Regions:
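A structural signal for short, well-ordered beta-strand segments
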Residues: 73, 675-677, 690-692, 810, ...
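Long, contiguous binding/interaction regions
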Residues: 697-886
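Short beta-strand element of the conserved SAM-dependent methyltransferase core
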Residues: 522, 573, 692, 783, ...
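Catalytic-core regions of core metabolic enzymes
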Residues: 1-689, 697
């Protein structure tokens, strides 16, 4: 999250080119040429002993001779000199450096040198960066780019050059174009933090091959995506591609899960990437998912409809009033419907009349206009007419419009006109629909992430008991637990298993079966045979003692023949579950090398290919996230929506997934969990067979997770002055209803002091932003009083840290009728202790001069108070280091 040095990299005031040259095709020549041609406003300092001047600019023989320290240095010399030059730049006080090339063997030393001098590095093996708004072309690219609102971050120089060339042809602009190279120091997450606050950037596009820190990426991406759309293309989906790119192995569905969890949108290929660039550059914000299609032919409209149907898109329904107006305005032979086929002889006048009527209606959320080449109706003329209509119509600048002028040669001029007018334009109907559905999916993801989760009922968790059982098993040397051994651990988290007994031989199996009643199931116990099905190690519906004995002996015989060296630890005996009309599912937790623990859901079966057969989510899960996973599984046909007799209980399965998530989050000793099959029968879910792989764990249990979980350890019971006890705890997404009720019990005056304006009502989006926080970046403590199985919020204090984790802005609010009980002070003390322990240096806030109680409290807590009467505010600052010392 660190932003140290990024300002000097992305907004440099001066640049030194180390190894500048007058020899064409040398890196130092190309970099100087591009810097000067780009129109950079600050001094450019070529450093080379070989030339007195480079491209007309006075050169300096070495770094020590520079007249001042540059903000940014670019190493264009032989890689063997990198370390010495970087050390000299650091000693001279340079803040940032772009390293164009360096072998892997240098990486460790280069990073150590940069950290010693508190420098930031872009690269190595970076194409460089372009910032058109500053006239900055610090790259190898010979292609000039226009100013725009789209930022592009790439981990591939080849993809960067391709996008630059493509954008030049379409006269597409960028706010930043950054090629990361090997990301030795500066990485995607830091740039996302910077661009999220950049006023010139309205959308961000990422090309990724790997991640160095998944947790930082998810955190930064989630924060940035709340304000700006972010699209991602990720290569290396197959093992062969991963080997080619030399990237970390990992499940591709895990990337999907992380991208969706952060509120981003993934595009799958280069074709979609180009459509995405066009969309992000020009498309206006989407209000909904209803699409209206206008075309001058049925065939291209049908292609668009097919693509819309395949992506589960939604057509708009025209009102009777709109249909009547269209009938009156258009020729009688035109069928008024959606899509609206104006026929192949549609003139520009027909397009204009249609647009005027549709723009005045509220029947759609996005408008797609298709034009096929026609001798009777030239495309350029219709394009001019459409652009002028959009410009003059009062609602023109608010409509989400997509244009598709089909064909190549005859439509070039029309597409150029649309690009100049800032209207998104695409070559094919399918590409246009793909772009539209990208924005629909992005909007849907953002909306889902802000939905208030339901509070699940009867959630059980006995973390201490589960830990004790796991530690005991590890101390005994166990590395894997089967269904019988794992039962008490699952029961500690409310997960139901079928009662299981262990039999050493066939006679004991018969004895157990007689005790529990028939029919029964027998299952092999062997740590050396990963899949019981390999030796037919599961026998079901055994109804007599003779059947049990024969089945047990048969299992033992098959193991001796197929796996003679395998250890046999007996048999598991279970009452036969009622499978009639039930559905068999599978829930697996595995550790991904990039994103840590993953929760996977699929159908039961012998073969298990999670990339194809399961949907994947990152823990921790709440009820909303678990429900999305189940619904995603149904939509992608990874699980069935119903069995032969019963519909799948989505709420019940969601609650089970939350319980599994809690178990995994709380117990880092768990390496892998496989519940297979999980029998779903109406509202009952029973784990019939479970395998749990375990190992000792030493360290921060949260560090293995890509998303920081709810910090239970920060909960604290506090007694107020009136003797009432309340719970201080971090805020939860489920707190939104209680927070709304709390705000309703705060006076307008107190709300004015807190928000510096009159607040009539908070929207759901406002409250979601307050409750659905990233605990890595923000903390909010609520004081909660429990009454009759309900909770009410009495007060809230909050701190939002900057990306460097140096400063945090704080606020505190207490229910107006509870002042004087010491609640505000206790909440502030809790927040101060947390921010200090979290490594922050300063806590800052503002209030109004007439908020005397807050000013007095701040003074008591050691804040510096700066009364600014002209501004009408009081600045409050607490030095946390001094606070710690005192």
């Amino acid at each position: 999250m660190s932003q140290q040095g990024l300002e000097a990299l992305l907004r440099p005031k001066s640049i030194a080119v180390i190894g500048a040259s007058m020899k064409p095709h040398r890196a130092g020549y190309l970099m100087m040429r591009n810097l000067l041609a780009g129109g950079f406003n600050g001094p450019v300092l070529p450093v080379t002993p070989a030339w007195k001047a480079v491209l007309g600019v006075m050169a300096w023989p070495d770094i020590a001779s520079l007249p001042f320290t540059p903000d940014l240095a670019i190493l264009c010399t032989n890689a063997s000199r990198n370390l010495a030059l970087l050390d000299a730049l650091g000693a001279n006080g340079c803040k940032t450096c772009i390293i164009l090339s360096a072998p892997t063997s240098q990486h460790e030393e280069l990073l150590a040198c940069a950290r010693r001098h508190k420098m930031r590095l872009l690269g190595p093996n970076s194409l460089g960066l372009l910032a058109p708004w500053q006239g900055l072309n610090a790259s190898f690219s010979p292609v000039p780019i226009k100013q725009g609102k789209l930022a592009f971050i790439s981990q591939s120089a080849a993809v960067s050059n391709t996008i630059l060339d493509w954008a030049q042809q379409r006269e597409m602009g960028f706010s930043y174009f950054i090629a990361l190279g090997d990301s030795l120091d500066i990485d995607v997450d830091e740039l996302l933090d910077y661009l999220a606050r950049d006023s010139k950037t309205s959308a961000i596009l990422l090309y990724l091959e790997q991640l160095s820190d998944a947790r930082r990426f998810v955190s930064a991406a989630r924060s940035a995506s709340r304000n700006k759309p972010i699209l991602v293309i990720k290569s290396g989906r197959s093992p062969a591609a991963q080997r080619l790119l030399n990237t970390s192995a990992g499940m591709d569905p895990a990337w999907d899960a992380a991208i969706q969890r952060a509120g981003l949108l993934r595009v799958q290929d280069t074709h979609e990437l180009f459509s995405a660039v066009e969309t992000l550059s020009h498309m206006r914000p989407l209000r909904g998912d209803r699409l209206m299609i206008i075309s001058n032919g049925a065939a291209p409209a049908a292609l668009a409809l097919d693509e819309l149907w395949s992506r589960n898109g939604k057509l708009a329904t025209l009102s009777e009033e709109t249909c009547l107006q269209l009938r009156q305005a258009l020729p009688a032979h035109i069928d008024i419907a959606n899509p609206l086929d104006l026929c192949d002889d549609a003139s520009s006048e027909h397009y204009v009349k249609t647009l005027d009527i549709l723009l005045a209606s509220q029947d759609f959320d996005a408008l797609m206009v298709i034009h096929s080449p026609s001798a009777a109706a030239p495309g350029t003329e219709s394009a001019h007419a459409l652009i002028e209509t959009i410009k003059r119509h009062p609602r023109g600048r608010f409509v989400t419009l997509l244009t598709n002028w089909c064909g190549e040669f005859s439509s070039q001029e029309a597409r150029r006109l649309f690009s100049e007018a800032g209207l998104p334009t695409y070559r094919t109907p399918e590409g246009t629909i793909t772009a539209f559905m990208h924005m629909v999916e992005y909007r849907r993801n953002q909306k889902q992430l802000r939905e208030t989760p339901a509070l699940p009922s009867n959630l059980t968790s006995n973390t201490a008991e589960a830990h004790n059982l796991l530690q005991q098993a590890i101390a005994e040397g166990a590395t894997s637990l089967d269904t019988h051994e794992v039962q008490p651990i699952l029961h500690a988290y409310g997960l139901h298993t079928l009662p299981t007994w262990i039999a050493g031989d066939s006679a004991e199996a018969v004895h157990i079966a007689e005790q529990i009643g028939y029919p029964v199931a027998l299952k092999l116990r062997s740590p050396d045979i990963p899949h019981k099905s390999d030796v037919q190690g599961v026998m079901l519906y055994l109804r007599t003692a003779n059947e049990v004995q024969q089945a047990a002996n048969a299992i033992f015989d098959r193991v001796k023949m197929a796996w003679p060296q395998a250890r046999i630890h007996g048999l598991l005996v279970q009452s036969m579950a009622n499978r009639a009309g039930a559905q068999e599912l599978r829930v697996v937790v595995e550790h991904d090398p990039v994103f840590g623990p993953l929760i996977m859901l699929g159908e039961g079966g012998v073969e298990w290919r999670p990339e194809e057969q399961a949907v994947v989510a990152l823990p921790p899960l709440n009820m909303n996230l678990a429900r999305y996973l189940v619904i995603q599984g149904i939509k992608q046909r990874k699980i069935r929506a119903r069995s032969a007799q019963h519909p799948l209980d989505i709420v019940g399965l969601s609650q089970l997934l939350v319980q599994v998530s809690n178990l995994i989050v709380d117990c880092p000793e768990i390496q892998r969990l496989d519940i297979h099959p999980l029998l779903a029968s109406a509202s009952e879910f029973t784990a019939l067979d479970v395998t749990l792989d375990i190992a000792p764990f030493d360290g921060d249990s949260e560090s293995r997770l890509a998303v920081r979980p709810y910090p239970h350890q920060l909960e604290e019971w506090v007694e107020m002055k009136n003797g009432d006890r309340c719970l201080f705890r971090p805020i939860l997404p489920e707190d939104e209803p209680q927070l709304r009720q709390f705000i309703a019990q705060v006076t307008k005056e107190d709300l004015y002091y807190r928000y510096f304006s009159e607040i009539n009502e908070f929207t759901h989006e406002d409250l979601a932003n307050m409750t659905q926080i990233d605990y890595d970046r923000e903390m909010a403590f609520v004081a909660v009083r429990r009454l009759d199985n309900t909770e009410e919020i009495l007060g809230v204090t909050r701190a939002i840290s900057d990306p460097d984790n140096i400063d945090a802005e704080f606020a505190v609010l207490v229910r107006s009728d509870l002042k004087g009980l010491g609640l505000g002070r206790r909440l502030m003390e809790k927040l101060i202790a947390y921010t200090r322990d979290h490594g922050l240096r300063r806590l800052n806030g503002i209030t109004m001069p007439n908020n005397r109680s807050m000013v007095a409290l701040a003074r008591k807590l050691g804040f510096q108070v700066d009364i600014q009467l002209e501004e009408g505010i009081v600045g409050l600052t607490l030095n946390l280091a001094q606070c710690d010392e005192s």
